[in-house]
Amino acid sequence: MIRIAIDVMGGDFGPDVAIPGAAKALERHNDVTFLLYGQKSKCDPILAQYPALREKSVFHDCEVSVSMDEKPSQALRRGRYVSSMWRAIEAVKLGEADVAVSAGNTGALMAMAKFCLRTMARVERPAIAGIWPTLKGESIVLDVGATIGADSQQLLDFALMGGAMARALFDIDRPTVGLLNVGVEEVKGQEEVREAGRLIREADLGTIDYRGFVEGDDIGKGTVDVVVTEGFTGNIALKAAEGTARQITTLLREAISRSFFAKIGYILAKSAFDVLREKMDPRKVNGGVFLGLNGIVIKSHGGTDAIGFASAVDVGYDMVHNGLTAKIENDLKIYHARRLPPPAPEALVADEE
């Protein structure tokens, strides 16, 4: 049984989205139980509408919640130990839950997750990994906002963790990985990116298939399974892609409504448009994964609806079901074991004596 802790008060719509979203996820996964953290007075009337969810849930009353515009430092001081966000994360730390899901303030969620769960041994900075629809299916892009200006060693860590996530999510033995750059030539790009490419190549990581540098358009093409970048660039790429998807949807809607014949054409091609809409629906790939922590935390978009929140719960379920944390820990252990210097000759002699 997989145990999922939910910050019910997080996001723009709080329990109005989180509770129906959890109920939708429950319809797809009958081997889960939920730990719901929120304000009882606001949640009880909504939870009463979903008896199946209520039966599979334990509710924890939390009068304190984190607002979407609250500074991370302020949220940590005010909400530590008592807020719905903190207590959902803490449930993972205490072993009461396998994963925490929140649509709340990203900065506050990362601050609380780092403070409560701590980073894995030898991981300098955590990353947020997003799932990206591509022409070939889906890919993983990280970091999309956790670490601004990552150095070469941190980018190598991201490659390892992203590869582990791809194996957990896509069931790929050796996922392909590329470093996002301004060109595919080895002489291009910032020094940190070029150095990261050298480190990954020389490390000869058996868990991933490093394909070198990739460009921005390679993300949508699905050129590689995992695209690695630092948080500033990754977040801009993510927001640009989301904006482009909304722009295309708006332009199509305007074009269809422009004339009678355009409407007839839409009716004739409706099935094709439905496929396009399904493919470009950001709710279907909602759920950023915090990688590099001693526990799994999923960040849902704050403005999503119940369908999108259910997708974030699905991601959390898949990460637990496929052993994400163990995969990352194992890959990091193998990599760092290879980096250890060989024992000195005198040490070998002493051991033999």
Swiss-Prot record:
- E.C. number(s) listed in UniProt: 2.3.1.274
In which domain of life is the source organism classified? Bacteria
Q: In which pathway does it act?
A: Lipid metabolism; phospholipid metabolism
One protein family per Pfam: FA_synthesis
GO MF term list: phosphate:acyl-[acyl carrier protein] acyltransferase activity
Q: Does the keyword Transferase apply?
A: yes
Query: Catalysed reaction per UniProt?
Result: a fatty acyl-[ACP] + phosphate = an acyl phosphate + holo-[ACP]
Task: State the GO CC annotations.
Answer: cytoplasm
User: What Gene3D superfamilies does the record point to?
Assistant: Isopropylmalate Dehydrogenase (3.40.718.10)
Kindly report the protein's main subcellular placement as a broad class.
cytoplasm
Q: Which UniProt keywords apply?
A: Cytoplasm, Lipid biosynthesis, Lipid metabolism, Phospholipid biosynthesis, Phospholipid metabolism, Transferase
Q: Where does the record say this protein resides?
A: Cytoplasm
An example of a Gene Ontology BP annotation on this entry?
Answer: fatty acid biosynthetic process
- Has the keyword Methyltransferase been applied to this entry? no
Function, in words: Catalyzes the reversible formation of acyl-phosphate (acyl-PO(4)) from acyl-[acyl-carrier-protein] (acyl-ACP). This enzyme utilizes acyl-ACP as fatty acyl donor, but not acyl-CoA.
The Swiss-Prot or TrEMBL record describes its family as follows:
Belongs to the PlsX family.
Q: Which NCBIfam families match?
A: plsX (TIGR00182)
UniProt subunit comment: Homodimer. Probably interacts with PlsY.
Name the UniProt record assigns to this protein: Phosphate acyltransferase
